[in-house]
């Protein structure tokens, strides 16, 4: 964010209180990435009653309604779902959202950060991979991807990309991961296997959406 001339404001309260505060300060809309789990849907419905929301679809590659069977019902099995999306996963590159160059930083005390103790947490020692940004993890993974298909099943081997947390919290989009994996200097079949795992993540969200 700071590379874009922006910063991150952190709030610790209920969603209702935070967004009522935004409305009282004169904000006219909220822009955010859509989420499909039950909690997120209820939260966003509550927020939308307070202040208009404009959602973007960047947490996943495909929208759950964009891949249906011929009878317009959702898939329940991964393989036919995945085959239906071949035109996507067989692509060399996916289009990514561009950053708005006209975003401006508002006046706010960005140095204020609630402590873990304030929020009822105990400080933990984070694993090494959480100290790295997504680009660093992808660079590390380039050395492991050719053995990923076999080694990923062994817990004693650091064989995965370690990107799950970064994907979940929007530090990198799945489209960016897809594109960066396709660019790696690795055997095509090994890159395709990892891309298939990305679509397993898509399918999990797909099932959650259609069968809550």
Give short role names for the model-derived ranges:
Residues 1-90, 190:
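Trp/Phe/Arg-rich N-terminal binding region typifying the photolyase-homology
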């Amino acid at each position: 964010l700071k590379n874009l001339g922006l910063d991150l404001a952190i709030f610790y309260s209920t969603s209702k209180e935070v967004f009522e505060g935004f409305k009282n300060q004169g904000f006219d809309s909220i822009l955010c990435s859509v989420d499909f789990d039950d909690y997120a849907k209820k939260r966003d419905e509550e927020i939308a009653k307070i202040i208009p929301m404009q959602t973007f679809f960047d947490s996943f590659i495909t929208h759950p309604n964009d891949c249906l069977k011929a009878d317009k019902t959702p898939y329940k099995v991964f393989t036919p779902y995945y085959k239906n999306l071949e035109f996507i996963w067989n692509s060399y590159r996916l289009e990514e959202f561009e950053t708005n160059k006209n975003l401006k930083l508002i006046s706010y005390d960005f140095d204020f950060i609630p402590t873990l103790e304030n929020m009822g947490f105990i400080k933990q020692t984070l694993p090494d991979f959480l100290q790295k940004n997504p680009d660093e993890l992808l660079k590390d993974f380039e050395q492991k991807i050719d053995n990923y298909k076999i080694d990923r099943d062994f817990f004693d081997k650091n064989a995965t990309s370690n990107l799950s947390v970064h994907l979940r919290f929007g530090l990198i989009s799945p489209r960016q991961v897809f594109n960066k994996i396709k660019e790696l200097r690795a055997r095509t079949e090994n890159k395709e296997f990892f891309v298939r795992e990305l679509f397993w993540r898509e399918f999990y969200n797909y099932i959650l959406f259609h069968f809550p």
